[in-house]
Amino acid sequence: LSVSSTKRIEGTKNDGLERRQFLTLSAASFAAALLPLRSQAQEVAEASFSFDNLVNEMRQLAQSAYVAPEPVEGFLADLDYDAYQRIRFRPEQARWQEKGVTFRLHAFHPGWLFKEAVKINEVDGDAVAPMGFTTADFEYDNDDLAQSVPPNAEMPGVAGFRLHTPLNRADVFDELIVFQGASYFRALGKDTLYGLSARGLAVNTGLSEGEEFPRFSEVWLRRPEPGDTTVMIYAALDSPSVTGAYQFAVTPGETTVVEVTMRLFLRKDVKQLGIAPLTSMFLHNGADKGDFDDFRPSVHDSEVLVLNVGKDTTLCRPLNNPPRLASSYFGAENPRSFGLAQRNRDFEHYLDAQAHYERRPSLMIEPMGDWGKGMVRLVEIPSDLEGNDNIVAYWIPEADTLAGDELGYSYRMHWGMNPPGATSQTLGRVVRLRSGHGGVAGVEADTETRKFVIDFAGGQLSDMPSDAELEPVVSAQNGEIVEAILSRVDGRNEWRLVLELRAEADAIVEIKAVLSGYDRNLTETWVYQWINA
Protein backbone atom coordinates (compact mmCIF):
# COMPACT_ATOMS: atom_id res chain seq x y z
CA LEU A 1 0.00 0.00 0.00
CA SER A 2 1.30 3.42 -0.89
CA VAL A 3 0.05 6.27 1.23
CA SER A 4 1.70 9.64 0.80
CA SER A 5 1.19 12.86 2.71
CA THR A 6 2.11 16.48 2.44
CA LYS A 7 2.24 16.61 6.23
CA ARG A 8 5.50 14.82 6.90
CA ILE A 9 8.03 14.17 4.17
CA GLU A 10 11.11 12.09 4.85
CA GLY A 11 13.78 13.25 2.41
CA THR A 12 16.44 11.12 0.73
CA LYS A 13 19.51 12.27 -1.16
CA ASN A 14 18.82 13.06 -4.79
CA ASP A 15 20.05 10.29 -7.07
CA GLY A 16 21.41 12.88 -9.51
CA LEU A 17 23.83 15.64 -8.53
CA GLU A 18 25.69 15.56 -5.26
CA ARG A 19 24.91 18.45 -2.94
CA ARG A 20 28.29 20.13 -3.58
CA GLN A 21 27.76 19.91 -7.35
CA PHE A 22 24.26 21.27 -7.03
CA LEU A 23 25.38 24.32 -5.08
CA THR A 24 27.92 25.24 -7.76
CA LEU A 25 25.38 25.37 -10.59
CA SER A 26 25.79 28.61 -12.46
CA ALA A 27 23.14 31.24 -12.87
CA ALA A 28 23.42 30.70 -16.59
CA SER A 29 22.49 27.02 -16.37
CA PHE A 30 19.45 27.87 -14.26
CA ALA A 31 18.33 30.49 -16.73
CA ALA A 32 18.81 28.04 -19.59
CA ALA A 33 16.61 25.50 -17.84
CA LEU A 34 13.80 28.04 -17.64
CA LEU A 35 14.14 29.70 -21.04
CA PRO A 36 11.84 27.26 -22.86
CA LEU A 37 9.06 28.00 -20.40
CA ARG A 38 6.27 30.14 -21.74
CA SER A 39 5.87 33.59 -20.25
CA GLN A 40 2.86 33.45 -17.97
CA ALA A 41 2.77 37.24 -17.78
CA GLN A 42 1.96 37.27 -21.51
CA GLU A 43 -0.86 34.76 -21.17
CA VAL A 44 -3.58 37.00 -19.80
CA ALA A 45 -6.74 35.18 -20.75
CA GLU A 46 -9.57 37.04 -22.40
CA ALA A 47 -12.19 34.38 -21.76
CA SER A 48 -14.28 34.53 -18.60
CA PHE A 49 -14.07 31.87 -15.91
CA SER A 50 -16.89 29.96 -14.24
CA PHE A 51 -17.20 26.67 -12.40
CA ASP A 52 -19.69 25.49 -15.03
CA ASN A 53 -17.10 26.10 -17.74
CA LEU A 54 -14.52 24.14 -15.73
CA VAL A 55 -16.98 21.26 -15.38
CA ASN A 56 -17.52 21.19 -19.13
CA GLU A 57 -13.77 21.28 -19.82
CA MET A 58 -13.12 18.34 -17.49
CA ARG A 59 -16.01 16.42 -19.04
CA GLN A 60 -14.42 16.88 -22.45
CA LEU A 61 -10.96 16.00 -21.14
CA ALA A 62 -12.27 12.66 -19.89
CA GLN A 63 -13.05 11.71 -23.49
CA SER A 64 -9.35 11.73 -24.35
CA ALA A 65 -6.49 9.57 -23.13
CA TYR A 66 -4.57 10.68 -20.07
CA VAL A 67 -1.41 12.67 -20.77
CA ALA A 68 1.13 12.65 -17.95
CA PRO A 69 2.44 16.08 -16.96
CA GLU A 70 5.92 17.11 -18.00
CA PRO A 71 8.32 17.14 -15.04
CA VAL A 72 10.31 20.25 -14.23
CA GLU A 73 13.74 20.42 -15.82
CA GLY A 74 17.26 21.63 -15.19
CA PHE A 75 17.89 23.35 -11.88
CA LEU A 76 14.41 22.59 -10.54
CA ALA A 77 14.76 18.88 -11.28
CA ASP A 78 18.10 18.75 -9.47
CA LEU A 79 16.94 20.24 -6.17
CA ASP A 80 17.61 17.79 -3.36
CA TYR A 81 16.28 17.65 0.19
CA ASP A 82 18.96 19.89 1.71
CA ALA A 83 18.54 22.60 -0.91
CA TYR A 84 14.75 22.52 -0.90
CA GLN A 85 14.61 23.01 2.87
CA ARG A 86 16.54 26.28 2.40
CA ILE A 87 13.97 27.82 0.08
CA ARG A 88 11.20 29.99 1.54
CA PHE A 89 8.52 32.17 0.04
CA ARG A 90 9.13 35.81 0.91
CA PRO A 91 6.23 37.09 3.08
CA GLU A 92 6.60 40.55 1.56
CA GLN A 93 5.80 38.98 -1.83
CA ALA A 94 2.44 37.63 -0.64
CA ARG A 95 -0.41 38.32 -3.04
CA TRP A 96 -3.52 40.31 -2.04
CA GLN A 97 -1.91 42.75 0.37
CA GLU A 98 -4.42 45.50 -0.39
CA LYS A 99 -5.98 47.28 2.57
CA GLY A 100 -9.00 45.50 4.01
CA VAL A 101 -8.31 42.15 2.31
CA THR A 102 -8.11 39.46 5.02
CA PHE A 103 -6.40 36.75 2.97
CA ARG A 104 -2.79 36.44 1.78
CA LEU A 105 -1.47 33.93 -0.75
CA HIS A 106 1.98 32.28 -0.57
CA ALA A 107 3.38 29.76 -3.06
CA PHE A 108 5.58 26.66 -2.71
CA HIS A 109 8.70 26.35 -4.84
CA PRO A 110 8.69 23.53 -7.44
CA GLY A 111 11.38 20.85 -7.35
CA TRP A 112 12.67 18.06 -5.10
CA LEU A 113 9.67 15.71 -4.60
CA PHE A 114 7.35 18.19 -6.33
CA LYS A 115 8.48 17.69 -9.91
CA GLU A 116 5.12 18.42 -11.58
CA ALA A 117 4.35 22.13 -11.58
CA VAL A 118 0.81 23.29 -10.86
CA LYS A 119 -0.59 26.27 -12.75
CA ILE A 120 -2.14 28.96 -10.54
CA ASN A 121 -4.62 31.49 -11.93
CA GLU A 122 -6.44 34.47 -10.45
CA VAL A 123 -10.10 35.20 -11.15
CA ASP A 124 -11.03 38.87 -10.81
CA GLY A 125 -14.66 39.47 -11.62
CA ASP A 126 -15.22 37.52 -14.82
CA ALA A 127 -11.63 37.85 -16.02
CA VAL A 128 -8.96 35.23 -15.41
CA ALA A 129 -5.18 35.54 -15.70
CA PRO A 130 -2.18 33.40 -14.70
CA MET A 131 -0.49 34.26 -11.41
CA GLY A 132 3.16 34.34 -12.36
CA PHE A 133 5.87 33.51 -9.82
CA THR A 134 9.60 34.13 -10.22
CA THR A 135 12.75 33.45 -8.23
CA ALA A 136 12.36 36.95 -6.76
CA ASP A 137 9.35 35.64 -4.81
CA PHE A 138 11.55 33.19 -2.90
CA GLU A 139 14.41 33.40 -0.43
CA TYR A 140 17.33 31.02 -1.00
CA ASP A 141 18.87 30.66 2.45
CA ASN A 142 22.40 29.75 1.38
CA ASP A 143 24.97 32.01 -0.27
CA ASP A 144 26.09 29.51 -2.91
CA LEU A 145 22.51 28.56 -3.69
CA ALA A 146 21.37 32.18 -3.88
CA GLN A 147 24.24 33.13 -6.19
CA SER A 148 23.35 30.31 -8.59
CA VAL A 149 19.80 31.61 -9.04
CA PRO A 150 19.26 34.38 -11.62
CA PRO A 151 17.03 37.27 -10.55
CA ASN A 152 13.41 37.28 -11.66
CA ALA A 153 13.61 33.94 -13.48
CA GLU A 154 10.09 32.82 -14.25
CA MET A 155 8.73 29.57 -12.79
CA PRO A 156 6.78 27.02 -14.88
CA GLY A 157 4.25 26.84 -12.06
CA VAL A 158 4.44 26.08 -8.36
CA ALA A 159 4.38 23.02 -6.10
CA GLY A 160 1.31 24.30 -4.29
CA PHE A 161 0.09 27.24 -2.25
CA ARG A 162 -1.16 28.27 1.15
CA LEU A 163 -3.52 30.96 2.36
CA HIS A 164 -3.03 33.07 5.48
CA THR A 165 -5.64 35.00 7.48
CA PRO A 166 -5.97 36.55 10.98
CA LEU A 167 -7.17 33.26 12.45
CA ASN A 168 -5.96 33.56 16.06
CA ARG A 169 -5.11 37.27 16.37
CA ALA A 170 -6.36 40.28 14.47
CA ASP A 171 -2.81 41.54 13.84
CA VAL A 172 -1.22 38.28 12.64
CA PHE A 173 -1.83 36.46 9.35
CA ASP A 174 -1.76 32.80 10.43
CA GLU A 175 -1.72 29.85 8.06
CA LEU A 176 -5.24 28.75 7.18
CA ILE A 177 -5.13 26.12 4.42
CA VAL A 178 -2.42 24.41 2.34
CA PHE A 179 -2.66 22.63 -1.01
CA GLN A 180 0.51 20.70 -1.90
CA GLY A 181 1.18 17.31 -3.47
CA ALA A 182 -1.25 15.30 -5.66
CA SER A 183 -4.72 16.32 -4.38
CA TYR A 184 -3.71 16.72 -0.71
CA PHE A 185 -4.73 19.68 1.40
CA ARG A 186 -5.18 20.50 5.07
CA ALA A 187 -6.67 23.34 7.07
CA LEU A 188 -6.72 24.82 10.55
CA GLY A 189 -9.35 26.08 12.94
CA LYS A 190 -8.59 28.54 15.72
CA ASP A 191 -5.87 27.41 18.19
CA THR A 192 -5.03 24.25 16.23
CA LEU A 193 -1.81 22.96 14.68
CA TYR A 194 -1.50 21.01 11.44
CA GLY A 195 -2.37 17.34 11.83
CA LEU A 196 -4.50 15.22 9.53
CA SER A 197 -4.90 15.89 5.81
CA ALA A 198 -7.64 15.54 3.23
CA ARG A 199 -7.55 14.63 -0.45
CA GLY A 200 -9.67 15.48 -3.43
CA LEU A 201 -10.17 11.80 -4.28
CA ALA A 202 -8.91 8.30 -3.44
CA VAL A 203 -8.65 5.63 -6.15
CA ASN A 204 -8.16 1.93 -5.31
CA THR A 205 -6.55 2.53 -1.92
CA GLY A 206 -4.98 -0.65 -0.56
CA LEU A 207 -6.22 -2.82 -3.43
CA SER A 208 -4.24 -5.23 -5.60
CA GLU A 209 -4.87 -3.03 -8.63
CA GLY A 210 -2.50 -0.48 -7.13
CA GLU A 211 -3.44 2.91 -5.74
CA GLU A 212 -3.71 5.84 -8.11
CA PHE A 213 -3.09 9.40 -6.91
CA PRO A 214 -5.05 11.97 -8.93
CA ARG A 215 -3.54 15.44 -8.85
CA PHE A 216 -4.84 18.97 -8.94
CA SER A 217 -3.19 20.04 -12.20
CA GLU A 218 -4.45 23.62 -12.31
CA VAL A 219 -5.98 25.95 -9.73
CA TRP A 220 -8.00 29.16 -9.92
CA LEU A 221 -8.39 31.50 -6.93
CA ARG A 222 -11.02 34.22 -6.90
CA ARG A 223 -9.42 37.48 -5.85
CA PRO A 224 -10.97 38.43 -2.48
CA GLU A 225 -12.49 41.86 -1.99
CA PRO A 226 -11.98 43.96 1.16
CA GLY A 227 -14.22 42.58 3.90
CA ASP A 228 -14.71 39.15 2.32
CA THR A 229 -14.87 36.38 4.94
CA THR A 230 -14.83 33.49 2.46
CA VAL A 231 -12.27 32.75 -0.24
CA MET A 232 -13.11 30.69 -3.34
CA ILE A 233 -10.75 28.11 -4.84
CA TYR A 234 -11.34 26.02 -7.97
CA ALA A 235 -9.25 23.08 -9.14
CA ALA A 236 -8.95 20.70 -12.09
CA LEU A 237 -8.27 17.08 -11.13
CA ASP A 238 -6.63 14.65 -13.54
CA SER A 239 -5.40 11.04 -13.49
CA PRO A 240 -5.34 7.99 -15.78
CA SER A 241 -8.79 6.91 -14.55
CA VAL A 242 -10.71 10.09 -13.77
CA THR A 243 -10.99 13.84 -14.32
CA GLY A 244 -12.76 16.25 -12.02
CA ALA A 245 -13.80 19.82 -11.34
CA TYR A 246 -13.68 21.08 -7.73
CA GLN A 247 -14.95 24.17 -5.98
CA PHE A 248 -13.83 25.04 -2.43
CA ALA A 249 -15.44 27.80 -0.37
CA VAL A 250 -13.12 28.37 2.61
CA THR A 251 -14.44 30.25 5.65
CA PRO A 252 -12.00 30.57 8.57
CA GLY A 253 -13.13 30.55 12.18
CA GLU A 254 -13.01 28.71 15.48
CA THR A 255 -14.11 25.83 13.28
CA THR A 256 -12.94 26.47 9.73
CA VAL A 257 -15.51 25.35 7.17
CA VAL A 258 -14.57 24.25 3.65
CA GLU A 259 -17.60 23.67 1.44
CA VAL A 260 -16.71 21.35 -1.43
CA THR A 261 -18.56 20.84 -4.70
CA MET A 262 -17.07 18.21 -7.01
CA ARG A 263 -17.92 16.74 -10.40
CA LEU A 264 -16.15 13.55 -11.53
CA PHE A 265 -15.83 12.02 -15.00
CA LEU A 266 -14.49 8.47 -15.27
CA ARG A 267 -12.13 7.52 -18.07
CA LYS A 268 -11.95 3.92 -16.87
CA ASP A 269 -13.74 1.50 -14.58
CA VAL A 270 -12.61 2.13 -11.00
CA LYS A 271 -12.91 -0.76 -8.57
CA GLN A 272 -13.09 1.49 -5.51
CA LEU A 273 -13.64 5.23 -5.56
CA GLY A 274 -13.04 7.05 -2.27
CA ILE A 275 -15.09 10.23 -1.76
CA ALA A 276 -13.92 12.87 0.76
CA PRO A 277 -10.82 10.90 1.81
CA LEU A 278 -9.02 11.71 5.07
CA THR A 279 -5.44 10.76 5.98
CA SER A 280 -4.02 10.76 9.50
CA MET A 281 -1.50 9.20 11.90
CA PHE A 282 -2.00 6.86 14.84
CA LEU A 283 1.09 5.36 16.47
CA HIS A 284 0.00 4.29 19.96
CA ASN A 285 -2.07 5.15 23.03
CA GLY A 286 -3.09 3.59 26.33
CA ALA A 287 -5.24 0.95 24.65
CA ASP A 288 -2.74 0.08 21.93
CA LYS A 289 0.79 0.65 23.21
CA GLY A 290 2.37 -2.06 21.08
CA ASP A 291 6.13 -2.47 21.45
CA PHE A 292 6.84 1.26 21.73
CA ASP A 293 9.25 2.17 24.52
CA ASP A 294 8.05 5.78 24.63
CA PHE A 295 7.78 8.20 27.56
CA ARG A 296 4.73 9.70 25.86
CA PRO A 297 1.53 7.83 26.77
CA SER A 298 -0.11 8.63 23.41
CA VAL A 299 1.13 9.62 19.95
CA HIS A 300 -1.53 10.33 17.33
CA ASP A 301 -3.04 13.04 15.13
CA SER A 302 -6.46 11.37 15.40
CA GLU A 303 -7.81 8.81 17.84
CA VAL A 304 -11.29 7.79 16.64
CA LEU A 305 -13.38 7.43 13.53
CA VAL A 306 -16.81 8.94 14.18
CA LEU A 307 -19.83 8.06 12.03
CA ASN A 308 -23.18 9.73 12.71
CA VAL A 309 -25.68 7.45 11.01
CA GLY A 310 -28.98 8.80 12.34
CA LYS A 311 -30.44 11.12 14.94
CA ASP A 312 -29.68 8.79 17.84
CA THR A 313 -26.99 6.55 16.35
CA THR A 314 -23.31 7.44 16.48
CA LEU A 315 -20.51 4.94 15.90
CA CYS A 316 -17.22 5.51 17.70
CA ARG A 317 -14.35 3.43 16.33
CA PRO A 318 -11.03 3.90 18.20
CA LEU A 319 -8.06 3.71 15.85
CA ASN A 320 -5.41 0.98 15.87
CA ASN A 321 -1.83 0.51 14.77
CA PRO A 322 -2.44 -3.07 13.62
CA PRO A 323 0.05 -5.93 13.19
CA ARG A 324 -0.88 -6.07 9.48
CA LEU A 325 -2.90 -4.09 6.98
CA ALA A 326 -6.49 -3.86 8.26
CA SER A 327 -9.77 -2.56 6.85
CA SER A 328 -13.16 -1.96 8.43
CA TYR A 329 -16.38 -1.12 6.57
CA PHE A 330 -19.44 0.66 7.98
CA GLY A 331 -22.57 0.64 5.85
CA ALA A 332 -24.85 3.69 5.83
CA GLU A 333 -27.44 5.54 3.79
CA ASN A 334 -27.14 9.32 3.62
CA PRO A 335 -25.00 9.58 6.77
CA ARG A 336 -25.26 12.80 8.74
CA SER A 337 -21.49 13.06 9.06
CA PHE A 338 -18.26 11.10 9.43
CA GLY A 339 -14.67 11.96 10.20
CA LEU A 340 -11.50 11.49 12.21
CA ALA A 341 -11.47 13.12 15.63
CA GLN A 342 -8.86 14.04 18.20
CA ARG A 343 -11.10 14.11 21.25
CA ASN A 344 -8.64 14.24 24.13
CA ARG A 345 -7.43 17.83 24.60
CA ASP A 346 -5.42 17.30 27.79
CA PHE A 347 -1.64 17.81 27.52
CA GLU A 348 -1.19 15.06 30.14
CA HIS A 349 -2.63 12.58 27.66
CA TYR A 350 0.33 13.14 25.30
CA LEU A 351 3.17 14.87 27.25
CA ASP A 352 4.75 16.08 24.00
CA ALA A 353 5.97 19.66 24.49
CA GLN A 354 7.03 20.00 20.84
CA ALA A 355 4.36 18.24 18.77
CA HIS A 356 1.42 19.25 21.02
CA TYR A 357 -0.88 16.52 19.78
CA GLU A 358 -3.62 17.92 22.02
CA ARG A 359 -3.94 20.78 19.50
CA ARG A 360 -4.35 18.69 16.34
CA PRO A 361 -7.68 19.41 14.61
CA SER A 362 -10.57 17.02 14.20
CA LEU A 363 -12.16 16.89 10.76
CA MET A 364 -15.80 16.01 10.18
CA ILE A 365 -17.37 15.55 6.75
CA GLU A 366 -21.00 16.68 6.47
CA PRO A 367 -22.61 15.33 3.27
CA MET A 368 -24.90 17.71 1.40
CA GLY A 369 -27.69 16.42 -0.78
CA ASP A 370 -28.47 12.77 -1.50
CA TRP A 371 -25.41 10.54 -1.14
CA GLY A 372 -27.54 7.40 -1.18
CA LYS A 373 -26.27 4.04 0.03
CA GLY A 374 -22.64 3.23 0.57
CA MET A 375 -20.10 2.69 3.30
CA VAL A 376 -17.30 4.37 5.17
CA ARG A 377 -14.06 2.45 4.84
CA LEU A 378 -11.32 2.72 7.45
CA VAL A 379 -7.82 1.58 6.44
CA GLU A 380 -5.20 1.05 9.15
CA ILE A 381 -1.58 0.46 8.13
CA PRO A 382 1.14 -0.91 10.44
CA SER A 383 3.67 1.80 11.30
CA ASP A 384 6.67 2.24 13.57
CA LEU A 385 7.21 5.97 12.97
CA GLU A 386 5.04 8.96 13.79
CA GLY A 387 6.29 10.52 10.55
CA ASN A 388 4.13 8.05 8.59
CA ASP A 389 0.47 8.69 7.95
CA ASN A 390 -1.08 5.26 8.42
CA ILE A 391 -4.81 5.97 8.71
CA VAL A 392 -7.17 6.51 5.76
CA ALA A 393 -10.96 6.94 5.81
CA TYR A 394 -13.41 7.74 3.02
CA TRP A 395 -16.91 7.18 1.63
CA ILE A 396 -17.49 4.46 -0.99
CA PRO A 397 -20.70 4.73 -3.06
CA GLU A 398 -22.67 1.49 -3.34
CA ALA A 399 -23.06 1.61 -7.13
CA ASP A 400 -20.28 0.46 -9.44
CA THR A 401 -18.11 3.26 -10.82
CA LEU A 402 -17.61 2.62 -14.53
CA ALA A 403 -15.99 4.31 -17.50
CA GLY A 404 -18.22 7.09 -18.80
CA ASP A 405 -19.91 7.70 -15.44
CA GLU A 406 -20.45 11.27 -14.26
CA LEU A 407 -20.68 11.72 -10.49
CA GLY A 408 -21.39 14.74 -8.34
CA TYR A 409 -20.93 15.25 -4.59
CA SER A 410 -21.12 18.20 -2.24
CA TYR A 411 -20.06 18.29 1.39
CA ARG A 412 -18.88 20.57 4.18
CA MET A 413 -15.59 19.95 5.94
CA HIS A 414 -15.40 21.14 9.56
CA TRP A 415 -11.81 21.58 10.86
CA GLY A 416 -11.36 22.46 14.53
CA MET A 417 -10.94 21.48 18.16
CA ASN A 418 -14.51 20.21 18.49
CA PRO A 419 -16.33 20.49 15.16
CA PRO A 420 -20.02 19.59 14.81
CA GLY A 421 -20.54 15.83 14.91
CA ALA A 422 -17.20 14.95 16.51
CA THR A 423 -18.91 14.56 19.89
CA SER A 424 -22.61 13.89 20.47
CA GLN A 425 -24.44 16.47 22.57
CA THR A 426 -27.07 14.01 23.78
CA LEU A 427 -25.48 10.56 23.82
CA GLY A 428 -22.94 9.38 26.35
CA ARG A 429 -19.55 9.00 24.72
CA VAL A 430 -16.51 6.80 25.08
CA VAL A 431 -14.04 8.75 27.23
CA ARG A 432 -11.49 6.01 27.84
CA LEU A 433 -10.44 2.63 26.43
CA ARG A 434 -7.91 0.24 27.88
CA SER A 435 -7.07 -3.36 27.02
CA GLY A 436 -4.91 -6.09 28.47
CA HIS A 437 -4.74 -9.77 29.33
CA GLY A 438 -7.79 -11.48 30.75
CA GLY A 439 -8.44 -12.63 34.30
CA VAL A 440 -8.48 -10.67 37.55
CA ALA A 441 -5.81 -8.68 39.35
CA GLY A 442 -3.63 -10.46 41.90
CA VAL A 443 -3.62 -13.86 40.22
CA GLU A 444 -1.89 -15.32 37.20
CA ALA A 445 -3.00 -13.70 33.94
CA ASP A 446 -5.41 -15.51 31.67
CA THR A 447 -3.55 -15.40 28.36
CA GLU A 448 -6.39 -17.20 26.59
CA THR A 449 -8.68 -14.16 26.86
CA ARG A 450 -8.42 -10.44 26.19
CA LYS A 451 -9.93 -7.77 28.42
CA PHE A 452 -11.38 -4.48 27.15
CA VAL A 453 -12.38 -1.70 29.56
CA ILE A 454 -14.59 1.02 28.07
CA ASP A 455 -15.61 4.07 30.12
CA PHE A 456 -18.69 6.08 29.07
CA ALA A 457 -19.67 9.55 30.29
CA GLY A 458 -21.60 12.67 29.31
CA GLY A 459 -24.85 13.19 27.46
CA GLN A 460 -27.85 11.47 29.00
CA LEU A 461 -25.59 9.50 31.35
CA SER A 462 -24.93 12.69 33.32
CA ASP A 463 -28.46 12.57 34.74
CA MET A 464 -28.51 8.86 35.54
CA PRO A 465 -28.47 7.78 39.21
CA SER A 466 -26.17 4.98 40.33
CA ASP A 467 -29.11 2.55 40.41
CA ALA A 468 -30.28 3.40 36.89
CA GLU A 469 -31.38 0.40 34.86
CA LEU A 470 -28.72 0.40 32.17
CA GLU A 471 -27.93 -2.61 30.05
CA PRO A 472 -24.89 -3.25 27.85
CA VAL A 473 -25.76 -4.57 24.41
CA VAL A 474 -22.65 -6.37 23.20
CA SER A 475 -21.76 -8.49 20.17
CA ALA A 476 -18.58 -10.04 18.79
CA GLN A 477 -18.12 -11.42 15.30
CA ASN A 478 -15.51 -14.22 15.08
CA GLY A 479 -15.06 -14.19 18.84
CA GLU A 480 -16.67 -15.38 22.08
CA ILE A 481 -17.81 -12.97 24.79
CA VAL A 482 -16.71 -14.60 28.03
CA GLU A 483 -17.87 -11.80 30.30
CA ALA A 484 -19.60 -8.40 30.10
CA ILE A 485 -19.95 -6.40 33.33
CA LEU A 486 -21.31 -2.84 33.64
CA SER A 487 -20.94 -0.70 36.76
CA ARG A 488 -20.81 2.92 37.78
CA VAL A 489 -17.37 4.24 38.74
CA ASP A 490 -17.49 5.43 42.36
CA GLY A 491 -16.85 9.14 42.74
CA ARG A 492 -17.06 9.81 39.01
CA ASN A 493 -19.98 10.38 36.73
CA GLU A 494 -18.83 7.52 34.49
CA TRP A 495 -20.01 4.04 33.65
CA ARG A 496 -17.48 1.27 33.05
CA LEU A 497 -18.07 -1.70 30.76
CA VAL A 498 -15.60 -4.57 31.18
CA LEU A 499 -15.51 -7.13 28.38
CA GLU A 500 -13.53 -10.33 28.26
CA LEU A 501 -13.25 -12.14 24.93
CA ARG A 502 -11.76 -15.30 23.53
CA ALA A 503 -10.88 -15.96 19.89
CA GLU A 504 -8.92 -18.31 17.70
CA ALA A 505 -5.32 -17.41 16.97
CA ASP A 506 -4.98 -14.79 14.22
CA ALA A 507 -8.74 -14.19 14.19
CA ILE A 508 -10.11 -10.78 13.22
CA VAL A 509 -12.80 -9.99 15.80
CA GLU A 510 -15.30 -7.17 15.26
CA ILE A 511 -16.71 -6.02 18.62
CA LYS A 512 -19.67 -3.73 19.23
CA ALA A 513 -21.11 -2.34 22.47
CA VAL A 514 -23.70 0.28 23.43
CA LEU A 515 -25.40 1.15 26.72
CA SER A 516 -29.18 1.20 26.54
CA GLY A 517 -32.02 1.81 28.93
CA TYR A 518 -35.56 3.11 29.09
CA ASP A 519 -36.25 1.85 25.55
CA ARG A 520 -33.45 3.77 23.87
CA ASN A 521 -29.72 3.90 23.32
CA LEU A 522 -28.08 6.16 25.89
CA THR A 523 -24.55 6.17 24.44
CA GLU A 524 -22.73 6.16 21.16
CA THR A 525 -21.93 2.69 19.86
CA TRP A 526 -18.36 1.59 20.51
CA VAL A 527 -17.00 -0.56 17.68
CA TYR A 528 -13.54 -2.08 17.61
CA GLN A 529 -11.42 -4.48 15.58
CA TRP A 530 -9.27 -6.86 17.60
CA ILE A 531 -6.70 -8.89 15.68
CA ASN A 532 -5.67 -11.78 17.94
CA ALA A 533 -2.10 -11.89 16.61
Locations of regions flagged by a protein language model:
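N-terminal secretory signal peptides
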Residues: 1-21, 28-37, 42
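Hydrophobic residues positioned within well-ordered beta-strands of beta-sheet architectures
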Residues: 118, 231-233, 244-248, 258-260, ...
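Primarily extracytoplasmic ectodomains and periplasmic/lumenal surface modules that are beta-strand-rich
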Residues: 82-85, 90-95, 126-130, 256, ...
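A contiguous, surface-exposed recognition patch within enzymatic or periplasmic domains that forms
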Residues: 82, 154, 177-183, 187, ...
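Acidic, contiguous internal or C-terminal segments within carbohydrate-active enzymes
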Residues: 235-284
